[in-house]
């Protein structure tokens, strides 16, 4: 009842209703008046009484209210549904090591863990190559990957394989003095390269020496040499084996250039007897042969770090005159590009000249006498006195302990001269040990030769040539492939040289 005496229909008092229910359960006669029943009723009454008192103490009357649900606006819900993009993180530089096959690699502490998408991509592509893929892209495959296609690990692994090993020499310049492009397949884009060329008269052993310096051993079969030697038939008819310029690159990335003999009578005889047509700028065959030799020598003086001059006796003065003529007709070092020419004006007068090594092949025992050796150095120094070629100071036989007991200053002006004896077989050594009766006197002792063995001398010559300095051939650092294109340009310039054309007209 309200203060006005009227009842309020929407007021609900749960405590009172529950009280009335248990109070109006029925007449007292229907109740169980036994002791257990009374105890149960008293417990129920006490419990309900406590509930009632609790409701009365809280707020008196309880009014049921409509629940209110709080929700965010639609714009805020869209922002909450879209996660914020993470800030761009710089890619760490990771030094990777080629892992062993069948051995999982554990990530190091502090290393960036790759995302799940990247891991799934690697698993989808297959087994990971031993080298990182980013190194493959740096070798020229990045453009293909950025164009939309992923890098194939198999193709990348093939790119990282070592270069193909050459088994024999190939032509760089053919017998008609035309340039050949087949050597570019064996070259790499690296700058640590040494170029060694050879010059010499016919039959002095140029191809044999270059084979022993490049890839072969004196014990190998001579038919397997990388540069073909003179066969018995060619030797009997006094012919030449090499024509043009042959090319070979070793596993140590050393380029060897074997050339046809200079001033060769066999080539002159071939021109005369076979009625080969001479180029229009040459009138006589011997002029053409000499100009061919000068072109090859001038080419080697421009593109080689080391030029070996082989002779089998001491000495031919015409050979030194030829070297001085080739030095005079050598093309000049190409000038730098116009972009850098203004800043390097002081370097315009610098001209490149290679190292010259004189090899005395088929030397006799008397040539290894210290007194004879000193006289040879003195004569060669006077013959090359006015030359700009680096003919001294880069190779020494005294440093190899070939002449034990001789001081280093025994030769006042030591030229780059190296003596090599005749290559002997095991049968020749056995015969040299035998006495007059044909029975070896000292079979356990080596025969006295007056010089070290052929194997030892070739090995020492090879080590000294490989350790020579490698100055820049041009004003820029050249890789192997850049050297090939540079050499092709030099060869074309040599063939069209006005100085060589003028000299050929002077020869008649």
Curated annotation (Swiss-Prot):
Signal peptide from the UniProt entry: none
BP-aspect Gene Ontology terms: nuclear-transcribed mRNA catabolic process, nonsense-mediated decay
Compositional bias per record (Polar residues), positions renumbered to this chain: 1-10
Biased composition, class Basic and acidic residues, residue ranges: 36-54
Keyword terms: Nonsense-mediated mRNA decay
Listed InterPro entries: P-loop_NTPase, SMG9
Region (Disordered): 1-59
Known role: Involved in nonsense-mediated decay (NMD) of mRNAs containing premature stop codons. Is recruited by release factors to stalled ribosomes together with smg1 and smg8 (forming the SMG1C protein kinase complex) and, in the SMG1C complex, is required for the efficient association between smg1 and smg8.
PANTHER family listed in its UniProt record: NONSENSE-MEDIATED MRNA DECAY FACTOR SMG9
Official protein name in the record: Nonsense-mediated mRNA decay factor SMG9
Biological classification of the source: Eukaryota, Metazoa, Chordata, Craniata, Vertebrata
Gene from which this protein is expressed: smg9
